[in-house]
Swiss-Prot record:
Binds 2 Zn(2+) or Co(2+) ions per subunit. It comes from Pseudomonas fluorescens (strain ATCC BAA-477 / NRRL B-23932 / Pf-5). This is Succinyl-diaminopimelate desuccinylase. Zn(2+) 1 binds at H73, D107, E170. Gene3D superfamilies: Zn peptidases.
Length: 383
């Protein structure tokens, strides 16, 4: 392991954060450490504890001019079996291959450290920078995400806080740091469908209504439906059934109902209302006695080429020499909440190959590269 004294400022901070076991929604004083550093750098701090979730908003600069916000989360997913790890998941070790190992190394304490060190350096080098540098940090991203970024954004919107650009530190890279940035995400619409039948004896089907038999053609049609064609930025909308439950456990009983859980990952070519109406039409066409509970996790958002994406892409090219690819693939992130403010949102972070896995790790030197990319982006937008 590399001695602590030999580590760069970014790696020192990343290790300090990883050593705090902040399994969602626990923050474990990660934000206290970050706020102390930002306060020392002249940032105005605003802690926002909402229910059992720690959040904070911090800003540095003028009230006039554009605002560049760094957003991220201090919470991490559970470790899984600790004995399966090569080292304690909260030890923050750098191995002989130069990999920083620990829960949160990639998702996303490495990014948090890079953001903070880049911002410290920027406000020192450019104390009279235009606009504002801001941070929006939560401990509720890996969990329900009700009282984290979503709730903070609602407060910021209520007081008409300006947010022009936002870099979310999610691990966007696939093979090399900066090779991919996310300039949007698909929407996520979940549903729990109940199809009601009539329970009975399997030997007397004329006295029962089998919800499995009734629902099967409708579910097959939903699975085969072509929802949209996507567009230049998004693939076509997808429909997936994740759970299907029916039956009493007995082999001689026709069940009384069937429950199917499904999810849409939808592009900007579809709307929530449109998808719901089309599902209802298919279920009605098959004459089902049905009920659906809908749950919208987030609407799709897209940041088209413009000031933020241009600055991030140019900084990646300047620091690494490579051209980045803008993508909307993958799951949802807190960017979906920030985008509701009309903010240009880009996700940029380290390689995501081991996120949420046992032995999560990231190339330690990548975090210093990421710091420089963030710093150069700050210069391009606010210097």
């Amino acid at each position: 392991m590399t001695a602590h004294a030999e580590l760069s400022p970014t790696l020192q901070l990343a290790c300090d954060l990883i050593r705090r076991p902040s399994v969602t929604p626990i923050d474990a004083d990660c934000q206290k450490l970050m706020m102390q550093r930002l306060g020392d750098a002249g940032f105005k701090l605003e802690p926002m504890r909402i229910e059992d979730v720690d959040n904070f908003w911090a800003s540095h600069g003028q009230h006039e001019g554009p605002v560049l916000c760094f957003a991220g989360h201090t919470d991490v997913v559970p470790t899984g079996p600790v004995q399966a790890w090569q080292n304690d998941p909260f030890d923050a070790l750098i191995d002989e291959h130069g990999m920083l190992c620990g829960r949160g190394a990639a998702d996303m304490k490495g990014s948090l450290a890079a953001m903070l060190v880049a911002a410290e350096r920027f406000v020192t080098d450019y104390p009279d920078h235009k606009g504002s540098v801001a941070f929006l940090i939560t401990s509720d991203e890996e969990g329900p995400a009700h009282h984290g970024t979503k709730a903070v954004v609602e407060r910021l919107a209520a007081r008409k806080e300006r947010l022009d650009w936002c870099i979310v530190g999610e691990p966007s890279s696939t093979s090399l740091v900066g090779d991919v940035v996310k300039n949007g995400r698909r929407g996520s619409l979940g549903a729990k469908l109940t199809v009601r039948g009539v329970q009975g004896h399997v030997a007397y089907p004329h006295l029962a209504k089998n919800p499995i038999h009734l629902a099967a053609p409708a579910l097959a049609e939903l699975a085969a439906e072509h929802w949209d064609d996507g567009n230049a930025f998004f693939p076509p909308t997808s429909f997936q059934i994740s759970n299907l439950n029916s039956g009493t456990g007995a082999t001689n009983v026709i069940p009384g109902d069937l429950v199917a859980v499904f999810n849409f990952r939808f592009s900007t070519e579809s709307t929530v209302e449109g998808l719901q109406q089309r599902v209802a039409a298919i279920l009605d066409k098959h004459g089902l006695d049905w009920h659906v509970e809908w749950a919208l996790s987030g609407l799709p958002f897209l940041t088209e080429p413009g000031a933020l994406l241009d600055a991030v892409s140019a900084s990646i090219k300047q620091v690494t020499g490579r051209d980045t690819k803008a993508s909307t693939s993958g799951g949802t992130s807190d960017g979906r909440f920030i985008a509701t403010l009309g903010t240009q949102v880009v996700e940029l972070g380290p390689v995501n190959a081991t996120i949420h896995q046992v032995n999560e790790r990231v190339l330690a030197s990548d975090l210093d590269v990421l710091t420089e990319i963030y710093y150069q982006t700050l210069i391009k937008l606010l210097a």
